[in-house]
Amino acid sequence: MSTEEKLYTPSEWSKRYRSEELISRFLIFAVNVTKKARNATKCLLDIPYGPTERSKYDIYGIDLPNDAPIFIFIHGGYWQELSKDFAGFAVPVLVANKIKVIPIGYDLCPNVKIQDIICQIKVAIETILSSAVDSGCRCVWICGHSAGAHLAAALLHDTKWIECMTERGYFPLIKGLLLAGGIYNLGPLTNTSYNEALKLSEDDIRELSFSILDTKGNNPIKNLKVIATVGECDSPVFINETREYAQKIMSFVDNVEYILLRDNIDHFDIVENLLDAEFVLTRLILKYMNV
């Protein structure tokens, strides 16, 4: 494995297990957690927001009051793996605290480009927000993990979309973004095996590398908190990019917080630990969603 490949392979940096075992354990754990959440929680699965098989989302906590807060989760997998079937970590604690949880599914590379996925995420969120406004929902937070953090961050850089969502009364409902273990500069990925599916062009890199975009023309975003967080046992590149991206968006987002999670937190247990009501990110979610 080349040095660059290792830097962009977060499983190589955990102190818990070797890379292959870590990924295997994560996948098994994620599937089991999601299955248990579906069995233990009143939910609606596979709600379509688009025409493709993967353009669906799930709603956990359908028996909660109409005005219950909503926590949207966007899974990772380098834009080319996983699905919402691996995305149930936040469900038990949040639903127990009267927060609905909505994991979003989306199409994967190489069948689509990253830009297509971003468009899907926007459509999904618009659909969810429309329903949330109609039901009197109190607030919405959006969480993205790994590549999902990049997809969530994309919302901040589409001023036309924000303006449209604001005019329709949707955007003010979003009170926060939680970006966990994200990647925000895609250029170096062209030197890794991940690009075989991504097929990034130079234009793609310029458009999608949010940490190096020119944001001078971005309108200020008020009344929105962004938490950019990463574990200390994630890849050094992911740690640096998270810190740099947090600094970048401070130029137009009024409330930004960078959190480096200690205690050997890595790229995977940063979301696994959402099962724990006392985990720092879980406590922050509950705090900011007014629970």
Each language-model region and where it sits:
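Short amphipathic alpha-helix adjacent to the substrate-entry channel of hydrolases
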Residues: 85-102
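Mobile cap/lid helix-loop segments that gate and shape the active-site cleft of serine hydrolases
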Residues: 182-216
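N-terminal cap/lid segment of alpha/beta-hydrolase-fold proteins
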Residues: 2-65
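Primarily recognizes the serine-hydrolase "nucleophile elbow" in alpha/beta-hydrolase
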Residues: 126-192
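Short, proline-enriched alpha-helix->beta-strand connector loops that line the catalytic pocket
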Residues: 171-175, 217-226, 252-254
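C-terminal catalytic histidine-bearing segment of alpha/beta-hydrolase fold enzymes
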Residues: 229, 239-246, 250-291
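Conserved strand-to-loop "acid loop" that flanks and positions the catalytic carboxylate
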Residues: 227-235
